[in-house]
Amino acid sequence: RVTTRIDMWKHAVTGEDFPVDAPDTVTASGLLKNGAEVGYQVASVPYNASGTCLEIYGRKGTIVLRSNSFNIGPSQVYLAKGNKKMEEVTPASEYILIPNEMAAGPGINVGQAYARFASAGEPGYTDTPDFDHAVVRHKLIEAMERSHNEGKVIHLD
């Protein structure tokens, strides 16, 4: 479902209200091939946004990723096994691709992206999205648009 919930925004500089008609909320739910249920909501809110949160609930526990902005960071990762208390965890060193001395902030994500890009040319490296990955994503986006426009569930192969 794609909707426009907020039809007036305040100008960041002048403070004046102005009308908007762009969609600001996308919600979706689905069932993956492996049987896992998926539900998500993406919303652009004008005030006091709580940031971004990704929660994954599995048979053995829960993992949560929180950030004011995933694309800028920093992000915090929390893990709870079974019914134990949620605790912040540090990603394993194998996932940190940039030097420790690199300054904190948005540059970290850019550095990580460049490190992955550089590794993409190495023999046997398979962690790089390709055209086939893009086609899958575009089929999903198209199915979401069709579902919204037609008001029905769209099944993907």
PLM regions: where:
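Short beta-strand segments
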Residues: R1-V2, G39-V42
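Glycine-rich Rossmann NAD(P)(H)-binding loop
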Residues: Q41-V45, Y57-R59, D157
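Glycine-rich phosphate/pyrophosphate-binding beta-alpha loops
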Residues: Q41-S50, G105
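C-terminal hydrophobic helical "lid"/dimerization subdomain
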Residues: A134-R146
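C-terminal capping/lid region of NAD(P)-dependent oxidoreductase domains
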Residues: R146-D157
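C-terminal glycine/acidic-rich active-site capping loop/insertion
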Residues: V2-L32, E55, R59-D132
